[in-house]
Design a protein with these regions (language model features):
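Basic nucleic-acid-binding alpha-helical/helix-turn surface characteristic of O6-alkylguanine DNA
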Residues: 1-96, 141, 145-146
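…primarily DNA-binding HTH/wHTH and HhH modules…
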Residues: 122-146
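Acidic, glycine-rich catalytic loops of TOPRIM or P-loop NTPase phosphate-binding modules used
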Residues: 106
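Residue-level detection of the helix-turn-helix DNA-binding "recognition helix"
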Residues: 103
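Short Lys/Arg-enriched helix C-cap and helix-to-coil transition segments
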Residues: 109-118
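Generic structural "secondary-structure junction" signal
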Residues: 56-62, 118-119, 125-128
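Structural signal for hydrophobic
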Residues: 73, 113-114, 138
Length: 146
């Protein structure tokens, strides 16, 4: 397993890679050093509003239902939002469970759980370092770039 951290326009990002595929991307700093120039460049392009879709080889680690939810989340387009309830209906579970699975997302930005909000229009939670403040920042970035 390779791990690296780097500073981006969104702050420190930590990435973990196994068998040449990303399985974890999170906000925060790690002490390990590996070259992830391609990922760093893509995140900075995203943060500048110049990249809407990541071209990164990754995989999910989780239960079949978690994987189904994350696959559904990955379909949410840049600048769009959906609700926990709508995702829940598509995969046959509860909105609360969808929220819990979003909180376990290890591929932040790549699997855009920040694009999922409550049915009343409130943001809900966000597991990335920085919480709701960061979720607002990401949604604002995407809304302003369209």
């Amino acid at each position: 397993m390779e791990t690296a951290s780097f500073k981006t326009k969104l702050g420190w990002i930590s990435v973990k890679k196994k068998s040449n595929r990303i399985f974890s991307l999170s906000f925060g700093k790690s002490n390990k050093k590996t070259d992830f120039t391609n990922i760093k460049n893509q995140i900075n392009l995203y943060a500048s509003g110049k990249l809407k879709n990541f071209n990164i080889d990754y995989y999910f680690e989780g239960t079949p239902l978690q994987k189904k939810i994350w696959k559904e989340l990955s379909k949410i387009e840049y600048g769009e939002v959906t609700t926990y309830g709508l995702i829940a209906k598509k995969v046959g579970t509860s909105p609360r469970y969808v929220g819990n699975v979003c909180g376990q997302n290890k591929l932040l930005l790549i699997i855009p759980c920040h694009r999922v909000i409550r049915s009343d229009g409130k943001l809900g939670g966000f597991s990335g370092r920085g919480g709701i403040k960061l979720k607002k920042k990401l949604l604002s970035l995407e809304q302003n770039v369209q």
